[in-house]
């Protein structure tokens, strides 16, 4: 027994020494890769010695810097993996030693400890078999296909853009960048260290050496996700001086569902302080109060309304509307704050948030053009938590009813316009004005930026404060929140950036792509109809 233990101890030492040497080698390669080039006469790759502009060299340097950053990240990840493997191996050897000692004392082990990892591995392999990787699936229509999105080392080409993303862009989220870098590294590893069952022969270079691929040999890739199975990656590599491509297919299977939390949430006593900044627009406020009375007073009954009014014109009308609703519905949970100054949405919401002095409260920052349901108010309560979560719902913005319902004599009532259709509106995924958050969280981040004047911008500033903090931001489209169409006026006093945002919002608010197209080609359509009518009349007369 002692001899066997000494042999095991000796093997453990050699194994740890080997892993340490391998770690040192990778670290040495990383230092060489990151070391600056000292050859001052060497030209940049692909650059002919001509007079180029400053922008050209800046773009080239930025591209090189991004390449080296990607490579450095790759090497750092490999070092971290080696450290983890070294630690895992040490723990395994330590556990083996402990088992040996316990076994000598006659202590037995249950035989099913390895059963769970084995079952999990079997499940993950079954996910590959279920996915549409090797064999196609029978689909009901052309819309059943899950399309791929393509990517290169620097760009992603995507189909689902919403209103804020671009057809071609660099991955903004760090997790997406890391995912694609990891996939390319895994593809390189598969090519350079093939399994015995891989149907490929080792390629040789011009001098007979084994070809070693790296990230720079990556040409393009495609990926798609089947929500219940996993993500499939198709990768293509090619050496610059060779005609053959190397194709690698990878699959990241989704594991079984795991319980994270099971809790009871009591929202029966949760009061929402709805804060509405307002200037003039008394007719819109009257319509808003109709929705408020139906939803908040008659159904929800756990609401406080705070209206922050700017200026003197229209103030008496707003007071009259509030008093009328109060007397008709016996509702007194409202506050009217009057500010004799120029309208500033951020300023109004700041004042409205601080006007509440009855302890912690959930706030809903709302505009006078918003229509919401009782179900949305409960979503507001469920998705905001003090010190943990803020809720930023995506509003469904309705198009101009005069265009949407142009074939009708008059547009239908507002309640009948609240439908989620492509020609009736769009998800306003570039807007961050409607939000549910607790007063303490709002005050802890400093509220709105008072330097932002006029239209837009202050919402994004507040949103970014939460993104840069520790709170979870819940961002999702919700069915019970609508932005009613109203004509926009972009003031000349706005900054160029604010004016651009205002015009962009105005254009997107007007009508769908198909309706705008019909308006552009209206004369051509009318001419076609006249020709058709003339031809029909001629044939009838003949």
Swiss-Prot record:
Residues bearing carbohydrate: 41, 333
Q: Where does a divalent metal cation bind?
A: 369, 486
Q: What is its main location?
A: Golgi
Q: Catalytic activity, per the record?
A: 3-O-(beta-D-GlcA-(1->3)-beta-D-Gal-(1->3)-beta-D-Gal-(1->4)-beta-D-Xyl)-L-seryl-[protein] + UDP-N-acetyl-alpha-D-galactosamine = 3-O-(beta-D-GalNAc-(1->4)-beta-D-GlcA-(1->3)-beta-D-Gal-(1->3)-beta-D-Gal-(1->4)-beta-D-Xyl)-L-seryl-[protein] + UDP + H(+)
Positions in coiled-coil regions: 59-105
Q: Gene Ontology cellular component?
A: Golgi apparatus; Golgi cisterna membrane
Q: Which residues cross the membrane?
A: 14-34
Q: Keywords of this protein's UniProt record, alphabetized?
A: Coiled coil, Glycoprotein, Golgi apparatus, Membrane, Metal-binding, Signal-anchor, Transferase, Transmembrane, Transmembrane helix
Provide the protein name.
Chondroitin sulfate N-acetylgalactosaminyltransferase 2
């Amino acid at each position: 027994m002692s001899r066997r233990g000494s042999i095991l101890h000796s093997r453990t030492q050699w194994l740890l020494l080997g892993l340490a040497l391998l770690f040192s080698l990778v670290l040495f390669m990383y230092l060489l890769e990151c070391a600056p080039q000292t050859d001052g006469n060497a030209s940049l790759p692909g650059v002919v010695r001509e007079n180029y502009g400053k922008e050209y060299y800046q773009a080239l340097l930025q591209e090189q810097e991004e390449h080296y950053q990607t490579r450095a990240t790759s090497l750092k990840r490999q070092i971290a993996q080696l450290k983890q493997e070294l630690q895992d191996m040490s723990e395994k050897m330590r556990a083996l030693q402990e088992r040996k000692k316990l076994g000598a004392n006659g202590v037995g082990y249950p035989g099913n400890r390895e059963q769970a990892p084995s079952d999990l591995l079997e499940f993950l392999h079954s996910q590959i078999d279920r996915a549409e990787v090797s064999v196609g699936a029978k689909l009901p229509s052309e819309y059943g296909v899950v399309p791929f999105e393509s990517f290169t080392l620097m760009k992603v080409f995507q189909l689902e853009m919403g209103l804020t993303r671009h057809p071609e862009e660099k991955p903004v989220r760090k997790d997406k960048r890391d995912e694609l870098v990891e996939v390319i590294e895994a593809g390189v590893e598969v090519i350079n260290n093939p399994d015995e069952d891989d149907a490929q022969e080792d390629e040789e270079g011009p001098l007979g050496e084994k070809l070693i691929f790296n990230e720079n040999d990556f040409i393009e890739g495609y990926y798609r996700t089947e929500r219940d199975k996993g993500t499939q990656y198709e990768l293509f590599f090619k050496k610059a001086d060779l005609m053959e491509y190397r194709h690698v297919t990878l699959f990241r299977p989704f594991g079984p569902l795991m319980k994270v939390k099971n809790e009871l949430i009591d929202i029966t006593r949760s009061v929402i302080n709805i804060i509405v900044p307002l200037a003039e627009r008394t007719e819109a406020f009257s319509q808003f109060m109709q929705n408020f009375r139906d939803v908040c007073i008659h159904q929800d009954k756990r609401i406080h309304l705070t209206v922050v009014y700017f200026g003197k014109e229209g103030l008496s009308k707003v007071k009259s509307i509030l008093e009328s609703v109060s007397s008709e519905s016996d509702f007194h949970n409202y506050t009217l704050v009057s500010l004799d100054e120029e309208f500033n949405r951020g300023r109004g919401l700041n004042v409205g948030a601080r006007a509440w002095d009855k302890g912690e409260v959930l706030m809903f920052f709302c505009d006078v053009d918003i229509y919401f349901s009782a179900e949305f108010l409960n979503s507001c309560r469920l998705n905001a938590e003090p010190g943990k979560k803020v809720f930023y719902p995506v509003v469904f913005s309705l198009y101009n009813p005069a265009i949407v319902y142009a074939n009708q004599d008059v547009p239908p009532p507002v309640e009948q316009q609240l439908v989620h259709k492509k020609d009736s509106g769009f998800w306003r995924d570039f807007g961050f004005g409607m939000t549910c958050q607790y007063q303490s969280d709002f005050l802890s981040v400093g509220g709105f930026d008072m330097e932002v004047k006029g239209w837009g911008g202050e919402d994004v500033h507040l949103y970014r404060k939460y993104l840069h903090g520790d709170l979870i931001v819940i961002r999702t489209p919700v069915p019970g929140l609508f932005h009613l169409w109203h004509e926009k006026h972009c003031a000349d006093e706005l900054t160029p950036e604010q004016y651009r945002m205002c015009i962009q919002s105005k254009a997107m608010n007007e009508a769908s792509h198909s309706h705008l197209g019909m308006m552009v080609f209206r004369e051509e359509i009318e001419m076609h109809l006249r020709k058709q009518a003339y031809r029909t009349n001629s044939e009838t007369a003949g």
